[in-house]
Amino acid sequence: RRNKAFAVRIGPTVVHHRWLAPTVKAAIADPGITALSQATPDETTLTGTRVLRTLDHLGWQPQAEGHGFAAGQPKFNYQLRLTDAEGAALTDEQLLKGMNQLWRRNIKKADKLGVTVTRGERADLARFHRIYLETAERDHFTGRGLPYFETMWDALNAEEPDRMRVYLAEHEGDLVAATTFIRVGTHAWYSYGASTTAKREVRGSNAIQWRMMRDARDAGADIYDLRGITEGLAADDPELGLIQFKVGTGGEAVAYLGEWDKPISSFLHFAFQQYLKRR
């Protein structure tokens, strides 16, 4: 109240449900299923269930789930395990075996066509940002400015050197894809990605993901997080292609608990919620 806040919002990083790749693929193929939450999870975690009940008991309010990506953190993510049940790192062959045929073919194609993937430096964020804006225009989303990524780089790498990286995929001297990568402990994230409209056939996006997966594993990560997906699975859903791209890696879709609000001023919180609905 001293800071004139009308609510507190949290987004617990606690996995509640998991759907393995075969389950997601079957759900996509089933015309009777239009949302991931309609498919039976392969696992519902006890911790997730307990935290959900505790939040509800303490008066926290779950945020309404809209279609597509919201302003906050995505509730549904796609993750790839980099270790086996005993905790041993997966080999390249094991990682490739978990992928679908299209992914394996595209990785091989990129290599055959001479796509090279390298790690960049801070100055290369400008090159990443150039095609990131091209991606934003093509895919109809509002991109962030270059200073945002430079600030992220400075802050994260000040905490721990090499926490944030930028990767560049090139073909015959042309930049065809670029990504940012973050690792904290044993969890690595594909943070932001970009690709050019030209030369999409050389499969730079597959090549750059393959490099990041292996680098994450070699750095000691046990999870490679491809981050957000939406839960829409209908054939005409505009985000279905994103899920199909990520599910091709193998891995699993996970649902976190979502974002929750604790109103401090019920009136102002209600007014804010109404504003968001009409925006």
Give each language-model segment a name.
Residues 6-12, 38, 118-120, 168, ...:
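A structural signal for short, well-ordered beta-strand segments and their strand-loop junctions
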Residues 3-4, 74:
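Residue-level preference for short coil/turn positions at secondary-structure junctions
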Residues 21-85, 222-279:
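Active-site/acyl-donor-binding loops of N-acyltransferases
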Residues 13-14, 124, 230, 260:
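Conserved beta-strand edge residues that scaffold enzyme active sites
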Residues 152-271:
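Aromatic (often tryptophan-rich) hydrophobic motifs at membrane interfaces
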Residues 1-3, 216:
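Hydrophobic pocket-lining residues that define ligand/cofactor binding sites across diverse proteins
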Residues 14-22, 43, 57-201, 215:
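A conserved beta-strand-loop-helix scaffold within acyl/acetyltransferase catalytic domains
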